[in-house]
Amino acid sequence: MLEEEQRKSLDAARQPMTGDRAIAVGGNVSGSILITGDHNVLEGITSLPTDYKARICNFILEYIGTPPRPVPFGGCQADLQTLDGWLDDPAALPYLLLTAPAGRGKSALLVRWLERRRDLALPVVFVPISLRFNTASQTVFFAALAARLAHLFGERVPADMSQAPDLWRGMASGYLSRPAPDRRLLVVLDGLDEATDWQAGVDLFPFEPPPGLRVVVAARHQANESGPEGWLRRLGWERNGLARSLTLAPLTHAGVSDVLRSMGVPLDALSARVDIVAELYRLSEGDPLLVRLYVDDLWQKGAAATRLQPEDLRTLQPGLHGYFDRWWEDQRKQWGRDAPLREPTVQATLNLLTTALAPLGKDDLLHLSNLSTWDLEEALRPLARLVVGDGRTQGYAFSHPRLGSTSARD
């Protein structure tokens, strides 16, 4: 009965909402306009000799989720409406810069916004720049960007992937300077700060954009920056009449409640528990990354989550350290007598992922850890909600870079 209720709730959650509720999303690969159908954002990218489709698809699914694995999201209705209003206003400035500290929910907001728009008449280019999903190099990023733009302009890209990245970059810049075939084009680039062997600069977008072009870029605040000014300057967007900025704020108490409600049965019952919401807000301090981690953990508990009491949370410290203290405590309870044997291998795996400069393949982890294949698989099992990748087509990495700064220890 509970599984049937969960299924119905998730089906309902995938429908666009109006009013003061943020969209509730369980996600559905077969129903996502972003990655399936005749107008998905991967069309054109698959024409490259090296297919980067899986990398971008996995990035999108990380924030949309699937029916058995819904991804917490909510409390962002005002930001979604701001993006809608900017896009729908023909007199709005052509460029929009989205900035915030790490973990504030920029990627989730953009992916959910594009999914919610569902506007088949608006051609969309979406290319994330992500270390975790191996799209941060200039070879991958500019080839994918150029290929997607070429598809929308009805043209072909070169079949030779050996050409210099500058050629792909120049090709993309050329398309962005031309009027779109349908006089409308939305380009969304997430994660400019994660670029590895290149930098986003004043040559990335035209200073005189063609009619109908709208561009959204997202980036984390850099060192000694607390606002959008640094990125506006790097892109040359500080001049009047070219760009507006949007900075994401932490979630409010109401936003945390909305995230719980969006998950459907059984967590929606907790959204009305003022005491539980207050404790989750205290622990997360409104940080969307932490809210997602705690709500993910509650979802895994199923119906037992509804028996959660505020006393169960009051001994925990706010922030990621408090979360990991609870996470280790829960793991030791699950392992029981095997905890002394299981904990060292899990911690060794976490430490390797923390110190790695890029995602690690399975063979890399086996070599560096001196673990057997069985021991490594057992060590990765409890890390499923913290680590992305399969070790083969996509290396293992933390689902968010901030997790690595807290999980390592001696």
Question: How does the language model describe each region?
Answer:
Residues 184-218, 363, 372-379:
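Conserved Walker B catalytic segment
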Residues 208-234:
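Sensor-1/coupling segment of RecA-like P-loop NTPase cores
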Residues 47-83, 155-159:
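Conserved adenine-nucleotide phosphate-binding loops and their immediately adjacent elements
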Residues 1-58:
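Long, low-complexity intrinsically disordered regions enriched in small/polar
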Residues 244-275, 293, 318-329:
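Conserved small helical "lid"/interfacial subdomain of P-loop NTPases
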Residues 99, 104-184, 192-194:
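Post-nucleotide-binding-loop coupling segment downstream of the phosphate-binding loop, primarily
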Residues 283-296, 361:
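The conserved phosphate-sensing helix
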Residues 111, 321, 325-408:
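C-terminal boundary/linker of central alpha/beta nucleotide-binding cores
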